Every structure is written in C-alpha cells, then in structure tokens.
Amino acid sequence: MQESKQLTPLMRQYNDIKSKNTDLIVFFRLGDFYEMFDSDAREASRILGIALTQRGGVPMCGVPYHAAANYISKIIKEGRKVGICEQVGTGEGKSKLFERKIVRVITPGTVIEDNMLQSNVSNYLVCVFTDKKGWGAAAIDVSTGEFWVTEQADDISLNGLSCMLAALNPAEILLDKITLDRVKSSMMIPGSVATTIVPREESSQIPSNWPSQSVWAGKKTALTCALTAIKYINVNEPGFKDLLIPFYKEISDYLALDENAVRTLELVSQNGARKGSLWHLLDFTVTPMGGRTLKNWILNPLLNLADIEKRQNCVSNFYDNPLAYEELKVILADISDIERIMSRVGTGNAGPRDLAGLARSLAVHGALKNWFDKYGAVVPYLKENILSKITVIEDLANLLNSAIEPNPPIKISDGGIIKQGFNAELDDLRNTKNNSSKTLAELCEREKAKTGISTLKVGFNSVFGYYIEVSKGQSGKVPFSYTRKQTLTNAERFITEELKEIEDKILHAEEKILRLETSLFDSVRKHLAEHIGVMRSFAKAIAELDVYSNLAHCAKVYKFTKPVIDESNILKAADLRHPVVEACLPLGSFVPNDIDLGGETQISVITGPNMGGKSVYLKQAAVLVILAQMGSFVPAASAHVGIVDKIMTRIGAQDAIAMGQSTFMVEMKETSHILASCTPKSLILLDEVGRGTSTFDGISIAWAITEFLYKPHGGGAKVLFATHYFELTDLENKYKGIKNFHAEVQEYKDADGQSKIAFLYKIKEGAGDKSYGIHVGELAGLPATVIVRAKKVIKDLEAKKGTSVSKKEDDIVGDLFSSPIVEEIKLVNTDAVTPMQALQMILEWKKRINS
C-alpha cells in the first residue's frame, strides 16, 4: 500500500472506510461502477473471474452497479461479506469529493434478495454458544422470518448440536472464541460456512414483542444466542429488528440425524448436488415454501406419535382423493414466495414485482375457499387455519389488485407501477402528461370562442414557457384577466391563471408522477407490513398443504404404502425398496428385500460380495424410518415402524486430511461416537467397520463392537452390520439376538467354461461363505492379465496351505475366539465400559495375540 501522503484524496477516503471494515469486501461506488481496491480487488478478481488492473500502483477491479447483485451473490456464496459503499452527498465545490459511507452490509446469513438465494432452500444464520455442560442456539432465516431458539444443558459431547447443524446447513454461524475452540476439533462446521466471532449479548432486557420472561426460564444460553443474533442482524439489516419474534423449539422432539447420516444417506444432496437425493426424488411441490418445508421435514422427522399420525392422515386423505390434489395444484401454481416477499415488505425493500407477485398469490383466495368447501375434510386443521385469515387475505388482494400494475417494471424509479383509477390526482397528472397537446388545443379553442379573437393561438418557448399570442390588430379584444408576458412587433403574448396551471402540470408532471407513485407504493407496502404475522401464518399453511398433497402424489407415482407407526421397537417391512436407487434403474428391475429388526433379531450381520446390495439394504432401512416418521407413505408392500430416536451411520470411507486424520482414525471416532450415544430406540448402520487396518485388527474390532452393541432381552439398539469379515457370523451361535444374512450370488459357467457370478441383490437369511473379490474385479474392468494372475496366486496359496484361504482364516479366527481372550471378553461389563476403554482393551488383546 502506498504511503498516506502519496495517496489521492479518493484513495485516502477509501482507506479510511476500509480500515473500519476490514472483514468486508468493500464495493466502493464510483459513478456507474462499484470498484474494489488492493486486497479486496485481488480476492474479488479471483472469485468473480474478472480482470485485475492497477491505478497508481494499486490493484483494482470493478463491476457495473446495475449488475452488482449477480457479483455480490458469487462473493456471498464463497462465505465472504460485502459492504456497499455509496455516494451519499455532494462535496462542497467542484474539487470536493462525494461523501461516501457503508450503507449496507450483506453477509451470507442476512441475504434477502431473491437473486442471491435458492428458492427452495432456507438460508439460516445460526448463533451458537457453549457452556460447561451443554449449548444453546438461535436459528434465523431473515429471508422468511423464521426464528427459533433451543438449548441442551446436558449435552457435553455436543452430539445434539452436531445433528442440529447437519439439519440446518447454515449459511453463516455466529460464535465466540470459546465455542469455536470446542466445535473446531469435531469438524461439525464445514470450511465453506462463514463464521463470525462475536461477543455474547447477555442482557436481562427481553424485547417487548418477544415471548414473556417465563419462556426463557432456565434457558439463559438460548436467550443469549437470540439477543446476540438480533444485534448482529440489526447492524446489517436494521429493518428486521421488530419483525423477528423467536419461539422455543425442543430439538429432542425430532429424530436425530448427524452429519454422517445426512451425507451418507444422501437425503438432500448427492456429491454436493440436489439431483440424486431423496429430496430431489420426492419434490413435486408447486410453491417455494413447499419445497423448503419438504426439505425441513426430511431432515427433521418427528418423534411424537400423535404428530406423525396427524401428518400421515392428511397424506392418506389426499391419497384417497386424487382430484383434491389435481385441483389444488392448479391453485398453488399461482402462488409466489409469500414468506420472502413479506420479509422484504417488512423492511421496506420489496419492489414493484414483489407486490405484483403477492397480488397474484392472494388472488387465489376465492379459488382456495371453494377448494376447502369441496375438500375441507382432507386437511381439517388447515381448513380452519386458512379460512380464518381469508377476510384479511381478500382485503389485501383487493388493495393490490386495484393499486399495482400486473406487470410493473423492476424499479420504482421507472414509473408505471400504480394502476389507473387508484388515485385521482395521479390519473390527472398522467392525463396531463399524455394529453398535453390536446389540452392546449382545447384551451385555445375555448379562448377563441370566449374572446372572439380568431387569430389567438397557444405557443411555447424555453424562455417564457407557455403563452397565448394575439395579433396587434386584435389586441384590443384581450380581456383584463390576461397578463402581458411579452410584446413583439406584430403580436402580444399573454398568460392566464388556467394556462399557468396547465404549464405547471405539464412541465412538472413526470416529476410529480414519480414522487406520487413512490408515495402511493410506499403506502401500500406499509399497509401490507401491518399484516405480516397473518401473511406468514398463511404462507406456512400453504406450504404444508403443498407438502401433504405432494407426498400423496409421490405415494401414487412410486407405489408407496401407508406404514403402521407405533411406540414399539419393531422395524419390519416386506418388499422394501430404496426409492432413489429404484428410480435410476429400468422399470421393474430393482430387487426388493424384507427387513425384520427389534423382535427376535436385534443385530443383523450381513455378509456377501461388494456390489451385492449390502449398502443399499442398509440405507433403505434408514430411508424407511425417515419417510415414516416425517408422515409419508413408504416404499414397501407393508411396513411396521416403531419410533426411532436416532439414525447413526458408519458408511463409506472419508479422510479428514485437514485434521491430520486417516480413514481408519475417522472410522474409529465415528464408531466411538455411535457407541457412546446410541439408545435402545436407535437405528445403527455399520458398513465394513474395521477394514481400514490389518485383517486381525479389523476382525477383533468389529467383533468387539458387535458384542458391545448386543443387549439381551431387547434392550439394545437395532443394528444392521454389513461386513466382509465372515468370522463375525459365528456370533449368531453365541447370542440369541444376532442373526446372519447374506447378499445372494449365483455362480455359473460361461460358454468357455469359465466361472462367472451374477448378483441377485437379494438379502437372504444365513451366512455367506465367499467374497468373490476376483470376480468383482473382473466386472469392474481390471485388465485380463491382472485377473489371470490373481486367480493363479489364490490357487497357489490354497495349494500351499492345503486348504482354501478363507477356510484357513476361519480356522485361525476360530482358535482366536476359543482362547482365554474370549473368556475375558465375556466378562466385560459393556454397560460400564466407555468406547475409548473398549478400544484400549482391543489393542491389549491384539498385542497378546501378536506375541
């Protein structure tokens, strides 16, 4: 950076502003461009892919102000904040600079513009603080007005926080240094999420429009989070302060899905994209609010049986009334994003097209009322909710319909927003502007008739404005009401009061029209803002209507059935399918499977080759639970789902390179978390646990984990354990609640007499006996020379050992588990051992085995 004395006045002004806003990329207004300088320019150039230039040795780049929103959006998506620095006043004298200041700060969590947001994705700002034993949080989507708080005072491991963040996928997180240090090691905040260090706003002063003091009793951390978040928002978007009212959300009312489960089950994304996820498959919603609500339901399945049945019954009613869905879909298609429009209305940022969209949305009130008259029994509680607001909706619809043009320009300053007939003064001004020639001609004819001056005419020049001109010969007929304005050689020019009024109207009509239109538009907007609570409630009800009808439609399209839901520990389904995988395959080619857990079987050990369908089997069990507990029908011929409190997964390999952790270390940490957190109501999915180390280490760990999870007399979590360790099948003989299954494979000879296999994708009861690894390699396209060599090596090994490799390993492991070590394992009180102690025991046993 240049020395201060070498800087131009403009750059000194910029540096002064930037020094006070070091965390922002400053969009510095210069005429028709926003310019960025120095480090901001370098970063913006990289993010935006625009040219980096120099002026006076200072790096700079710029974007047109009228297209700034697109560029700001790209920067926000990178997790950065933008400060809009505008010219707010003119300098004194020609040499003086424009006065400039930051007029708005846009952060990833405070965006409200549609073109910076995804229509069907919530945009959360989350504030999190931890204390000695737990944590509190506030979650706000300023674009919709959603605002809730929660607290878990007894979650020292922060498991609940991890699940909450996984479900929210926040755009921005506020925390203090203490909290950051605690959550950093757990990797629960992705690197792409913007994080801001803020001080805690601890105050006993609760805003008057918030819930009363009693709601916050014992929830000090949650209240602190709420106050801190509001203070942060108020700095960046002052208009929101009085529009955001929190409610308390008990997250223990929802099925817990941690980040691993959300990611590996591909609930809302697959490899970062929405396509290929469960959400994408299920989303036939018509409104943006419906799309966001559907995603929220997928990530937050319910635990309360009555609430689940309430949703399920609404879906079932739509399922039984397909015409109700078809007719509702037509109505909902005209509804815009009411939630986000109303947030912009409340802050005074709603534009003409926002109100035009709102007008179209509210115009459905008549059709919606008729629909409820016809199909109200389908969703009785929503009927009452929506119809109670119909009078207000109708009044607002009438206001918008009479006031706002249906296809207005983007900006208020472009004019043409207010409808003809809404305001008499505006109509008069427009008539004056549009009919000025006609008005002047009519005046001229009236004055000729009144005065009898046949040569009278009306004219205009830039010096004197409008005038009435009379020839010298007829000037004697001019009435006393005329005021002389100019004398010419052959004529006299006059002005009258009426002509003055017409002149004023014509010359100032455009300015007055714009000023009056702006005032009228603002008046309509303020009137709408008075009903923001009703409108948000209406939008929420519309979203639920959309989702209920959508889920019924999915049930028809994908041939889902209504499951039995209860408080039991049963997880049972006949002909269960994975709906996303099924949708990717040719019609009718997906192979369904049965599942039966929680009765006689607590743990299913599933063996078989890669590509045999084990992982899909695990995932479809989880999808079954999620769909059932969100109130949906399920992809099975029949299903019985006892409510599950947590779905915990250890599926797939993932290095934590940034944390210096190997695949195996990540696997062990995730497994340790599962062992420490599961309950008898949990569903655990384990896929190839232990494979990241040596064979004996892996077998030992997998064996010990299975024993740790096993609880006699139905006291343990439901577990599906897919493994290549065939040795684990011995556990079925030792424990009554463990049962073996295998992925079925068909062996056959091809035309050349070569052994081949076909995957049948059927999960059958009983243990598998081969891994078919070489066959899988062949199917995957390994070079023929590699396959031939592998077959020769395994034959040589089997010949050398005098038995098959797999049989020999079975014998070794059999010896291992008949040794004194197994007696020690039997004596371990698994209820009293922590996951870390269990792993230490395993390492000790390993040392003794190797010695």
Swiss-Prot record:
Single GO MF annotation: damaged DNA binding
Keyword annotations from UniProtKB, A to Z: ATP-binding, DNA damage, DNA repair, DNA-binding, Nucleotide-binding
Gene Ontology BP terms: mismatch repair
Protein name: DNA mismatch repair protein MutS
Pfam families membership: MutS_I (PF01624), MutS_II (PF05188), MutS_III (PF05192), MutS_IV (PF05190), MutS_V (PF00488)
Gene: mutS
Family affiliation: Belongs to the DNA mismatch repair MutS family.
Keyword Lyase tagged: no
Gene Ontology annotations for the cellular component aspect, listed alphabetically: cytosol
Binding site for ATP: 608-615
Superkingdom of the source species: Bacteria
Annotated function: This protein is involved in the repair of mismatches in DNA. It is possible that it carries out the mismatch recognition step. This protein has a weak ATPase activity.
Listed SMART domains: MUTSac (SM00534), MUTSd (SM00533)
